[in-house]
A protein has these predicted regions:
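Short linear regulatory motifs enriched in tryptophan with gly/pro/ser
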Residues: 1-200
């Protein structure tokens, strides 16, 4: 991932909704990035594989604006999607109280709540030389995200039931489908930051 000169850095909390125990991450990113770049960072941070469409939704005073990748061949159901590649994070989410939702895989509809925990302003341009100010990184998190195409929250719940019960009639089948090494409790900050450092 390239370096970013930014007057702000954002501390974000990302949580996958409707799953208990929660699957969440805390990351810090430069404010100057586009929402599309933020999407790519979320993919790496959460553990998704960037195999499906996505949408950001920002609601202010009961008005919702939707961001994503406009596609003339896709029926957007009148959402009037704004191009996330041309939309900067710091120009869109300009206050800490704003909440953003991120939907990944419009079929499975994985909904993530994005909370801005803190926005820090760069006081001295010399800090641009400090990679901590301009390099996205993960600070903390818990649990692995579901496998791709698990069927949304309902399908994921059934998958865990099968994986956690060796006597379940679909235990072996689900182990093979999810990957023999899949562990729903596994999460590594170090692995995420290594992947972020190599993100194109």
């Amino acid at each position: 991932m390239g370096s970013y000169q930014s007057e702000k850095r954002y501390y974000l909390h990302i949580q996958l909704l409707d799953i208990v125990p929660p699957i969440w991450r805390r990351i810090v990113v430069p404010g100057a990035i586009s929402l599309h770049t933020l999407h790519k960072m979320f993919q790496v941070t959460m553990g998704w594989e960037n195999a499906h469409l996505y949408l950001f939704r920002l609601t202010i005073n009961e008005k919702t604006t939707v961001y994503g990748l406009p596609d003339p061949d896709w029926d957007d159901a009148g959402l009037r999607i704004r191009d996330s590649r041309r939309t900067k994070l710091d120009a869109t989410v300009w206050a800490e109280w704003l909440k953003l939702t991120y939907e990944y895989d419009l079929g499975d509809s994985w909904m993530h709540q994005i909370t801005v925990e803190r926005i820090e302003h760069v006081a001295d341009e010399s800090v641009y030389e400090d990679a901590l100010w301009i390099t996205p990184r993960c600070l903390a998190g818990e649990r692995a995200c579901p496998p791709e195409d698990a069927g949304g929250v309902g399908g994921y719940t059934l998958l865990l039931e099968a994986l956690q019960n060796p006597r379940h009639p679909e235990h072996e089948q689900m182990r093979q489908w999810a990957g023999m090494s899949y562990d729903s409790e596994l999460f590594s900050v170090q692995q995420v930051n290594s992947a972020l450092a190599n993100l194109d």
